[in-house]
Amino acid sequence: MIVIPAVDIKNKKCVQLIQGNPDKKHIELDNPLEVAEKWIKCGAEMIHLVDLDSAIYGTDTNKETIKKIIESVPVPVEVGGGVRTVEDALNLIDLGAERVILGTSAVKNPEIITELLEKGINSEKIMVALDAKDGKVVIKGWMEKTEYTPIEIGKILEEKGAGSILFTNVDVEGLLDGIDIEPVKKLVDELNIPIIASGGITTYDDLLKLKEIGVDGVVVGSAIYKEMMDLKKAIKIVKGE
């Protein structure tokens, strides 16, 4: 299992939001590249970049910042936030993204995965973000609730050729209260593709629980920014060192 630090970008700055609310920030740092480099020095083997402006407003304010990070860091970078079309995904892959994270677009129209595969994009480069609230998948920056469970959507996405799922439990995201293991376990048990877990991961114990149920990776955000968790130590613990 790999521990992936999140670098969320809003208006060219690195931020951490509370439950995805653009008006509720509890961290704001001026230089996202420096933040990414700091996490790599701690042993991060991948960086999880999210373009919040693109996700929330559909703007490309952060394009140059993202490009600079991808070009500057020595580890793979996965990028999400506002990847709405095949063209958006291809542009990020052209910038050098190791994986693109599709959200609402793939949940509403799983054919986007087929189209990317037809363009010659390897399925390992296609990750789909499944965000759940009260047991149902939510879309459009967590603003709109669907009638479907993560497993129902996850199976469709897997069938279409998604390479991995990024699962975020919105109920616990950014609250620093720890994880709810059950919904993650259900997804791991029901799907065959790798599951990356996100949302509420606060303690080393959370990491070990996720490792135990077979999660392939975890994205950590608030806990490392608020220094409740030491990234270097977290990576060592997960590796069993």
From Swiss-Prot:
Q: Where in the cell is it found?
A: Cytoplasm
Which one of the record's GO molecular function terms can you name?
1-(5-phosphoribosyl)-5-[(5-phosphoribosylamino)methylideneamino]imidazole-4-carboxamide isomerase activity
- Entry keyword set: Amino-acid biosynthesis, Cytoplasm, Histidine biosynthesis, Isomerase
Under Gene3D superfamilies, the record lists: Aldolase class I
Question: Main subcellular localization, coarse class?
Answer: cytoplasm
Would you say which domain of life the source belongs to? Answer: Archaea
CDD domains linked: HisA
Pathway it works in: Amino-acid biosynthesis; L-histidine biosynthesis; L-histidine from 5-phospho-alpha-D-ribose 1-diphosphate: step 4/9
Protein name, as recorded:
1-(5-phosphoribosyl)-5-[(5-phosphoribosylamino)methylideneamino] imidazole-4-carboxamide isomerase
**Which Gene Ontology terms describe the biological processes this protein takes part in?**
L-histidine biosynthetic process; L-tryptophan biosynthetic process
According to the UniProt record, what class of enzyme is this?
isomerase
Query: Can you tell me which residues form the catalytic site?
Result: D8 (proton acceptor), D131 (proton donor)
State the family named in the UniProt similarity comment for this chain. Answer: Belongs to the HisA/HisF family.
Provide GO CC annotations from the record: cytoplasm
EC numbers listed for it are: 5.3.1.16
Q: Which HAMAP family match?
A: HisA
Q: Does the keyword Amino-acid biosynthesis apply?
A: yes
UniProt xrefs under InterPro entries:
Aldolase_TIM, His_biosynth, HisA_bact_arch, Isoase_HisA-like, Isoase_HisA-like_bact, RibuloseP-bd_barrel
- Is-annotated flag, keyword Cytoplasm? yes
A Pfam family recorded for this sequence: His_biosynth
Q: Which reaction does it catalyse?
A: 1-(5-phospho-beta-D-ribosyl)-5-[(5-phospho-beta-D-ribosylamino)methylideneamino]imidazole-4-carboxamide = 5-[(5-phospho-1-deoxy-D-ribulos-1-ylimino)methylamino]-1-(5-phospho-beta-D-ribosyl)imidazole-4-carboxamide
